[in-house]
A protein has these predicted regions:
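Glycine-rich phosphate-binding loop signature in dinucleotide/nucleotide-binding domains
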Residues: 3, 97-102, 129-132
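Residues at the starts of beta-strands that form the adenosine-phosphate
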Residues: 5, 49-51, 103, 135
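Conserved SAM-binding loop
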Residues: 26, 53, 106
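Short glycine-enriched, charge-decorated loop/helix-capping segments at active-site entrances
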Residues: 22-28, 78-81
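A short, N-terminal amphipathic alpha-helix
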Residues: 33-51, 62
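N-terminal nucleotide-binding beta1-loop-alpha1 segment
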Residues: 1-21
Length: 157
């Protein structure tokens, strides 16, 4: 199990409420924007074997098809799973329906700074962690702010 196959799951919903067509509108010199950037990064990542693109956006599906890349497995997501009200639990179940076995890398088009080299590094760290009986890896950010709730300070005295 040193090098298990890695399938990237890329959910990409049409209908952003704040920025219309945000996933495919021109951005940073890329004609097809965030989806173009993310698919390029995942295709270039040596440790990503397949990319399951789940979207309800025909324009994104057409763009992905135009790439003619065997790594990409496009999936037309049903509208029931494409609303802003769709729960994370429902989306996780959907991912497992599409990728019933193997190892999943979950990523988003709205993370354009995670490039191919970083994906490869993360996957290599994951594969190393598997040898120590870990079964998952999650990236996080250290918060250097002062957090409060209704009872007062949370992360300091």
């Amino acid at each position: 199990m040193n090098n298990p196959k890695i399938t990237a799951f890329l959910p990409c919903r049409k209908g952003s409420q704040r920025v219309p067509k945000k996933n495919i509108k021109p951005f940073a010199g890329f004609e097809f924007g965030l989806i173009q950037i993310k698919l390029k990064q995942l295709i270039e990542a040596c440790n990503v074997d397949k990319i399951v693109l789940s979207t309800n956006d025909d324009e994104i599906l057409n763009y992905a098809a135009s790439l003619q890349n065997d790594k990409i497995i496009p999936h037309k997501r049903v509208e029931l799973l494409s609303s802003s009200e769709t729960s994370t639990d429902d989306l996780v179940a959907h991912a497992l329906d599409l990728i019933p076995q193997g190892h999943i890398l979950w990523t988003h088009v709205t993370s354009p700074f995670v490039n191919a080299q970083l994906y490869d590094k993360i996957i290599q760290q994951y594969r190393t962690a598997l040898l120590d009986d870990y079964d998952s890896l999650m990236t996080t950010n250290l918060i250097h702010g002062f957090l409060w709730d209704e009872n007062g300070p949370i992360n300091y005295d």
